[in-house]
C-alpha cells in the first residue's frame, strides 16, 4: 500500500502505529553508497490537523519514507538488525546499507504493473579507459490505492548519475566515486466537488530532493601498518511543500487571535461563519555529512589485529518559511497557532569520534574473533541551558565469535560458529523535537455578544511559552544477542536470540502550569441602551487562575523487544532443481511510558473543570506477540530458462494485551501550581476523588489471533539468452484464514489476492 508513508520497524510484533513509539523507525539508519539519509531537519507537519487524509501522511518524526527509495539500481542490501560497528551512529534500531550498481555496459529496461501501481525504469552503464565507469538511471512510479479513484494518488520520480574511477598504482589502489541524485514524491488526495457541495477539499504534499556525494577509498598493498583511508562528503537539499485547502462552516461565533509574539492583552476579531481556508507548509531541509577514517594493522605476532579510527560530522538545518496561512481565515479556527519560519530554528551539529579494534586469533582449528568499539557523540549549536550542550554520549559495543573445529559426518564437514554481542546505540533528537513551536495560550477575559456586530467585543490575554526542550537527551537502546550458525554440505541453519531495551525513546508529554487572567463581568450591561463596545475600565473584574496544559517532548517511552529469529536453507536438489528456504521468528514487544505523566480529568462540577491535575506513574502499557514462518520453494531449470517460486506464509499466532494500570496518582497539582503527594484518604474528597482513574483496570484481556496461511506464486521466463525476463506473480493465491471466536463474537477474516506482471530487458 503506497497511499501512506511506509516507515520501517525492525524486530517488532504487530508494529504500533502510535507516534509515541516512533523512535524505532526514526532510529533506523539508511545508507546509500555510504551516504546517510537524514530526516533530522524534516518539519513537514500541518499543525493542529485532525483529518485522517492529513495525519496519516505525516511522517515528520517517523524517519525515512521507504516509498521514496528506488530499488532497481541496487546491487546489494545489508540489513543489520543486531549490533553494528561503531563506525555507524545516530541510530537505535538498525542499519540498512544499500550499495548500487557500478560499471557494466548494459541498457536495462523494466516495466511492472500490478493492481495498485505502475513502474517504469531505464538504466545504462558505461566502462572505458583505465577504470572509468558511469551509470545513469531514471524511474517513474504511479500508485493509487483504488484504481477507480484518480483523486488520490502517489507518484515518484527519481534519477541518478554515478561516476567512478579506479587507480591501480604500485603501492596502493585508489577508488573514487561521485554520485548525483534527484528524487521527487508527489502525494495527495482531494474530494470531488460534486460530492462536497461544490466546495474544494484537497491535500497535497510535494517533495523534491537533490543530493551530491563524493567518496575516496585508498587501500595499501602488502604488509603495511596503514591499510586503508576513507573520505566521504555528502550534502542534500530538499524542497518540501504541503498545501491544505478546505471550506469552513462555523456553527457559532468564533474569535480569531491577532499576531502577538509576547505576553500581552488585545481584542480578538470575529471570523465569518463560512469561508475558504488555506494553509501551506514550506520546508527546505539542508543536510551535510563529512566522514574520515583510517584502518591500521597492528604488528602482533600470531594475531590479526586491526584498529579503525574515525570521525564524522553532520549538520541539519531547515531554511523554509514554515507554516503559512491567513490569520483572518485560519484553517483550524479552534486552535491557537502563529507562524514561525523554520529558518529561525538553529542548525544542529552532530560530531562523533570512534575507535574500534578487531582481533582475530587462530588456536589450532579454532578461530576466535573479538570486536570492541567506542563511539562518542556531542551536539553543537545548542544554547547553554540545554542539557545536551554539556554532554558527550558514549556508545560502547562488543561482538565476539568462536568458530569451532569442523566435524566430519559421513565424510562431509560440519562447521559451527557461535557469537554474542552487547552494545548501546543512541539517536539524537530532530531539530523539531529540540526546538518546537512556542505555545500560545489564549485566555478569554471578556466575551460580550450583542445582536449588533459593531457592539460585540472579545478581549484575550495571551501567554507565549518557549517550548524548547532543554532537558531532552538522546534516545538509548541497549542490545544483547546470542546466535549460532551451522553449515553442512550446503545446508545452512542460523538462529539468533535477542533482547533490546530502549527506555528513553522520544514521547510527546503534557505539562500543566497555572496561568493568571482577569474575568470581566458583563451582567450589568444594558444591551438596549449601549451605544459602543463595553470598556474594560467600566466593568467589574475578578482575578482567576487556570491550569493549562501544553505538550513537550521528553524521553518518556520504553520499547522492549525480545525474540528469536531463525533461517534454514537447503542446497538445490538437482533432480527437481529445487531449494527450500525456511525463515521465521517469534517476537514479543512491550510498549510503555517510562516517565510520570500528567492528566487532568475532564469532569465539570458547578460549571468548572476539576481544578487539579493528577501525576501518574503509568498511563500506557501493552504487549504484542507474533510468531510466523515462511516456507519458500525455489525452482530453477536452466535448460528451460524457467524459474518458479512458491512460498507459504504461516502466521502461527499473534496477540496483544494491555496491563492494568495503577488508578491512583502518586501526586497532584493544585490550582496554584504546587505539587502535593497523594494520600489514601484523598479518594474520599469531593473533588480529589475524580483523580482516581476509573477505567485503569479495564480491558486487560489478551486478544489472540489464531493460525492463518497465504500462498504466493511467481514464475519467471528468460528469453533471448537471458536478455529478456518476463515474470508474473500472484500473492495470496490461496489462503487459509478461518473464522474464530473472541469474547463471544465470531471474527470473520478474508484476504484479497494481489497479482502483477513485470518485464526486464537488457540490451
Predicted features along the sequence, with ranges:
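Gram-negative outer-membrane beta-barrel transporters
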Residues: 501, 518-662
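Structural signature of Gram-negative outer-membrane beta-barrels, strongest in the C-terminal barrel
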Residues: 346-492, 496-501
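Face-selective signature of the C-terminal outer-membrane beta-barrel domain
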Residues: 167-183, 205-385, 406, 563-565
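N-terminal periplasmic accessory domains that precede
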Residues: 6-10, 30-31, 63-67, 87-111
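Short acidic/polar hinge/loop motifs at secondary-structure boundaries
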Residues: 35-80
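Extracytoplasmic beta-strand/coil segments of soluble accessory domains associated
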Residues: 1-49
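C-terminal beta-signal and adjacent terminal beta-strands/loops
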Residues: 426, 502-504, 510, 650-694, ...
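Transmembrane beta-barrel wall of Gram-negative outer-membrane proteins
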Residues: 108-142, 149-236
Amino acid at each position: 500500500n503506497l497511499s501512506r508513508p511506509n516507515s520501517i520497524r525492525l524486530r517488532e510484533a504487530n508494529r504500533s502505529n502510535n507516534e509515541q513509539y516512533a523512535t524505532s523507525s526514526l532510529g533506523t539508519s539508511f545508507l546509500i553508497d555510504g551516504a546517510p539519509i537524514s530526516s533530522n531537519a524534516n518539519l513537514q507537519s500541518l499543525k493542529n490537523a485532525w483529518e485522517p487524509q492529513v495525519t496519516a501522511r505525516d511522517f515528520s518524526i517517523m524517519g525515512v519514507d521507504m516509498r521514496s527509495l528506488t530499488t532497481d539500481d541496487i546491487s546489494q542490501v545489508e540489513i543489520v538488525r543486531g549490533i553494528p560497528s561503531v563506525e555507524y551512529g545516530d541510530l537505535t534500531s538498525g542499519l540498512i546499507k544499500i550499495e548500487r550498481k557500478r560499471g557494466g555496459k548494459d541498457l536495462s529496461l523494466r516495466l511492472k504493473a500490478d493492481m495498485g501501481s505502475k513502474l517504469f525504469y531505464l538504466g545504462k552503464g558505461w566502462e572505458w579507459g583505465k577504470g572509468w565507469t558511469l551509470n545513469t538511471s531514471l524511474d517513474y512510479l504511479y500508485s493509487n490505492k483504488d484504481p477507480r479513484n484518480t483523486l488520490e494518488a502517489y507518484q515518484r520520480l527519481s534519477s541518478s548519475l554515478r561516476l567512478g574511477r579506479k587507480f591501480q598504482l604500485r603501492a596502493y589502489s585508489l577508488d573514487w566515486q561521485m554520485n548525483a541524485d534527484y528524487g521527487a514524491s508527489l502525494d495527495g488526495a482531494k474530494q470531488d466537488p460534486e460530492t462536497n457541495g461544490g466546495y474544494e477539499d484537497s491535500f497535497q504534499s510535494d517533495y523534491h530532493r537533490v543530493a551530491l556525494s563524493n567518496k575516496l577509498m585508498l587501500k595499501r598493498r602488502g604488509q603495511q601498518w596503514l591499510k586503508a583511508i576513507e573520505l566521504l562528503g555528502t550534502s542534500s537539499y530538499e524542497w518540501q511543500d504541503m498545501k491544505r485547502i478546505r471550506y469552513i462552516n462555523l456553527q457559532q461565533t468564533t474569535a480569531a487571535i491577532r499576531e502577538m509574539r509576547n505576553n500581552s492583552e488585545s481584542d480578538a476579531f470575529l471570523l465569518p461563519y463560512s469561508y475558504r481556508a488555506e494553509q501551506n507548509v514550506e520546508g527546505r531541509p539542508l543536510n551535510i555529512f563529512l566522514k574520515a577514517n583510517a584502518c591500521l594493522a597492528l604488528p602482533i605476532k600470531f594475531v590479526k589485529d586491526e584498529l579503525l579510527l574515525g570521525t564524522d560530522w553532520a549538520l541539519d538545518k531547515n531554511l523554509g518559511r514554515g507554516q503559512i496561512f491567513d490569520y483572518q481565515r485560519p484553517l483550524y479556527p479552534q486552535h491557537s497557532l502563529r507562524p514561525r519560519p523554520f529558518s529561525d530554528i538553529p542548525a544542529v551539529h552532530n560530531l562523533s569520534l570512534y575507535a574500534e579494534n578487531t582481533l582475530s586469533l587462530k588456536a589450532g582449528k579454532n578461530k576466535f574473533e573479538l570486536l570492541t568499539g567506542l563511539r562518542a557523540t556531542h551536539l553543537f549549536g545548542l544554547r547553554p541551558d540545554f542539557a545536551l550542550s554539556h554532554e558527550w554520549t558514549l556508545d560502547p559495543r562488543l561482538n565476539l565469535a568462536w568458530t569451532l573445529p569442523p566435524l566430519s559426518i559421513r565424510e562431509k564437514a560440519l562447521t559451527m560458529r557461535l557469537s554474542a554481542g552487547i552494545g548501546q546505540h543512541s539517536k539524537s533528537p530532530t531539530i523539531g523535537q529540540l526546538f518546537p513551536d512556542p505555545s500560545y495560550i489564549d485566555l478569554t477575559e471578556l466575551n460580550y455578544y450583542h445582536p449588533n456586530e459593531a457592539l460585540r467585543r472579545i478581549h484575550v490575554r495571551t501567554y507565549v511559552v518557549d517550548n524548547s526542550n532543554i532537558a531532552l537527551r538522546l534516545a538509548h537502546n541497549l542490545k544483547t544477542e546470542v546466535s549460532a550458525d551451522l553449515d553442512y554440505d550446503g545446508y545452512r541453519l542460523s538462529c539468533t536470540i535477542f533482547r533490546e531495551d530502549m527506555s528513553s525513546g522520544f514521547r510527546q508529554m503534557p505539562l500543566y502550569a497555572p496561568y493568571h487572567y482577569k474575568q470581566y463581568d458583563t451582567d450589568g450591561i444594558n444591551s438596549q441602551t449601549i451605544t459602543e463596545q463595553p470598556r474594560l475600565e467600566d466593568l467589574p473584574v475578578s482575578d482567576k487562575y487556570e491550569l493549562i496544559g501544553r505538550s513537550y517532548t521528553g524521553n518518556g517511552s520504553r520499547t522492549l523487544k525480545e525474540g528469536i529469529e531463525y533461517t534454514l536453507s537447503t542446497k538445490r536438489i538437482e533432480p527437481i532443481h529445487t531449494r527450500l528456504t525456511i525463515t521465521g521468528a517469534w517476537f514479543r514487544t512491550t510498549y510503555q511510558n517510562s516517565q510520570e505523566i500528567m492528566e487532568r480529568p475532564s469532569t465539570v462540577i458547578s460549571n468548572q473543570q476539576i481544578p487539579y491535575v493528577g501525576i501518574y506513574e503509568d498511563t500506557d502499557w501493552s504487549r504484542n506477540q507474533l510468531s510466523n514462518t515462511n516456507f519458500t520453494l525455489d525452482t530453477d531449470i536452466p535448460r528451460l530458462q524457467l524459474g518458479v517460486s512458491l512460498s507459504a506464509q504461516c502466521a502461527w499466532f499473534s496477540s496483544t494485551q494491555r496491563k492494568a494500570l495503577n488508578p491512583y496518582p502518586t501526586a497532584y497539582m493544585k490550582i496554584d501550581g504546587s505539587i502535593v503527594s497523594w494520600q489514601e484518604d484523598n479518594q474520599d474528597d469531593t473533588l480529589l476523588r475524580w483523580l482516581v482513574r476509573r477505567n485503569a483496570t479495564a480491558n486487560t484481556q489478551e486478544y489472540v489471533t489464531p493460525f492463518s496461511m497465504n500462498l504466493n506464486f511467481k514464475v519467471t521466463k528468460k528469453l533471448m539468452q537471458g536478455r529478456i525476463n518476463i515474470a508474473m506473480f500472484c500473492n495470496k493465491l490461496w489462503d487459509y484464514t478461518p473464522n474464530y471466536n473472541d469474547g463471544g463474537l465470531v471474527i470473520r477474516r478474508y484476504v484479497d489476492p494481489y497479482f502483477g506482471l513485470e518485464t526486464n530487458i537488457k540490451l
